[in-house]
Each structure stands twice: as C-alpha cells, then as structure tokens.
C-alpha cells in the first residue's frame, strides 16, 4: 500500500531525482568516452561536471531586443516541472502526494515543459533558438498522443489514475509484459520529452544548438539539468506504471524501486547513445501512421479485459 509521505519526503524526492540525473550524466559520459576511444574511468565520468563552477559564475549572454523575462521563465520552467513531476511517483511504499489523478499530474508537468522550452526559444529574439523551440512543438505533437495512450493503457488496466493503484494492480503480472507496446512507447516518450538522444532535434548541431544556442552560464546549466532531470523522472515513473512498483522478493519495497529505476535509466542512457537523431517530420509520420494506431489498440486490450471480468 502506498502512503503519502511526511514533510521530509519533500526534501528526499528532489534529492533522489538529482542523484539519479547525476548518475545518468556520468553514465552517458562514460559511454561517450568509450565510443570516442578515450580512457574509460572516473575521469571520464566526472568530465561533464568540470564546467559547472565556471557556468555558475559566467555572465549571461545579452541579445538586442530579447525578452529577458520570458527567456528566464522558460529556462526555469523545464527543471522545475521535472521536479514537480516527482510528487506523485511512489518510491517503495512512500509518495510525496498520493493524488487520485497522479497520472494526469505527471502528464501535465511534462506538457508544461513544452511551454518552457518554447519560451526559452522565443525569448532570445534569435532565429536558431526560435526554430529549435518550434521543432520541439512539432516533435511534441508527434510523441504526445502515443505517450498519452500509453499512460491511458496503464491507468485502464488498474481502473484508476492513482499511481499507487496502478503499481498495486500488477501483483500478478507486470504491465510491461502484457502491454509491451505501451511500455516501449512510454520509454520513447521519456527520451522525447527529455529532448535527448534520437529526439535531440530541437538542440541540433545544424541549428548551432537550437534552443541552447544563445544560452550561457546558469541559464544553460538549468536547461541542461532539466533534460537529465526529466530523463530520471521518466525512468522512475516507468517503475510503478509498468514494472510493478516496489513489489519483489527478498528486498524492501524502496530497494526494488531503486533497482528497477536504475535499470530503466541505464537502458535509456544506452539507447540515447545508440540511435541517431530523428528529424521531426519523419517522427511525425511514424507517430501518426504507426504509433497512434498501435497504442489505441493497446489501450483497448485492458479495457476489454476489464469488461470481461
């Protein structure tokens, strides 16, 4: 049974999310070093963090006619939305807020990132960031519907939008096993709303960094942190939605939640280094022709099962 946590969970949840994001960045750096033929070790793992002190003291870039307020609001929204999404993610038997509409809350925070990233592209009053922001909107329109149907599949199976109820409903069989399409689409959606790996089109090199192109200092650090915080949050949410939450033999519930989250996070980091960047127009075609019909059929499966009970 998942219970709403005490006040201290408000501190633990963001701290744990940050730790998972740091592990993901370190793991990605190690894979990058191996692919580049450099020495793999502690030095490779900490390399991305060496520039953090310099970024903290760097002067923000100022552009003519930029809307500094919208720019800063967009930059801050991305990591803040990622942290807020963790309020409904149970860790073991504890959750910060056991909302009856937890799935909706998580999805709403993810959609909030759309607005944040678009503002981060609009605010600088520069062509490349603006195009990057619009690229994310196009990408979002493609991945959001399949992602929503994947979330609906899990919620329909449990007949509840409460994340704890969805985890508890998998006591006999994980949803990842009998809803494999929903699970795979959800993982792709995590990479998409993190705009990492194959979905890094909004920050592509052909746009000189796109949304990230004009950011510097703390602003750039916040946007980059937001990407990895969302990856960690998405990996953690996969556990109660599709992998039975903290259920498992031998270990306490929190330990199983941690193990499963680390495995999903490791898989996502490995995938984002394996796949090339997908152009938004190609992903739109794939989503509307293939993914949306598949996820609709997948969502019908638990609905029919519940009707026949």
Residue spans of the language-model regions?
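Alpha-helical transmembrane segments of multi-pass membrane proteins predominantly involved
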Residues: 1-309
């Amino acid at each position: 049974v998942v219970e709403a946590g005490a006040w201290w969970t408000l501190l633990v949840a963001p701290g744990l999310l940050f730790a998972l994001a740091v592990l993901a960045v370190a793991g990605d750096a190690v894979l990058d070093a191996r692919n580049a033929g450099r020495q793999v070790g502690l030095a490779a793992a900490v390399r991305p963090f060496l520039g953090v002190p310099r970024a903290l003291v760097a002067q923000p870039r100022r552009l003519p006619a930029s809307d500094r307020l919208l720019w800063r609001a967009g930059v801050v929204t991305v990591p803040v939305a990622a942290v807020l999404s963790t309020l409904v993610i149970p860790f073991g038997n504890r959750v910060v807020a056991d909302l009856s509409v937890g799935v909706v809350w998580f999805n709403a925070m993810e959609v909030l990132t759309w607005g944040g990233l678009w503002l981060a592209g609009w605010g600088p009053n520069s062509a490349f960031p603006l195009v990057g922001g619009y690229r994310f909107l196009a990408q979002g329109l493609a991945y959001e519907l399949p992602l929503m149907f994947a979330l609906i599949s899990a919620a329909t199976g449990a007949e509840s939008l409460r994340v704890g109820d969805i985890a508890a409903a998998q006591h006999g069989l994980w949803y990842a096993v009998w809803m494999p399409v929903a699970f795979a689409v959800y993982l792709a959606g995590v990479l998409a709303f993190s705009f990492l790996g194959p979905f890094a089109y909004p920050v592509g090199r052909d746009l000189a960094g796109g949304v990230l192109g004009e950011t510097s200092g703390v602003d750039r650090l916040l946007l980059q942190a937001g990407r990895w915080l969302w990856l960690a949050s998405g990996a953690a949410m996969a556990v109660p939605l599709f992998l039975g939450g903290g259920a498992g033999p031998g270990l306490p519930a929190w330990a199983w939640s941690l193990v499963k989250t680390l495995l999903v996070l490791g898989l996502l980091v490995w995938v984002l280094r394996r796949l090339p960047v997908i152009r938004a127009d190609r992903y739109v075609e794939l989503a509307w022709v293939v993914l949306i019909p598949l996820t609709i059929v997948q969502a019908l499966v638990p609905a029919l099962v519940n009707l026949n009970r």
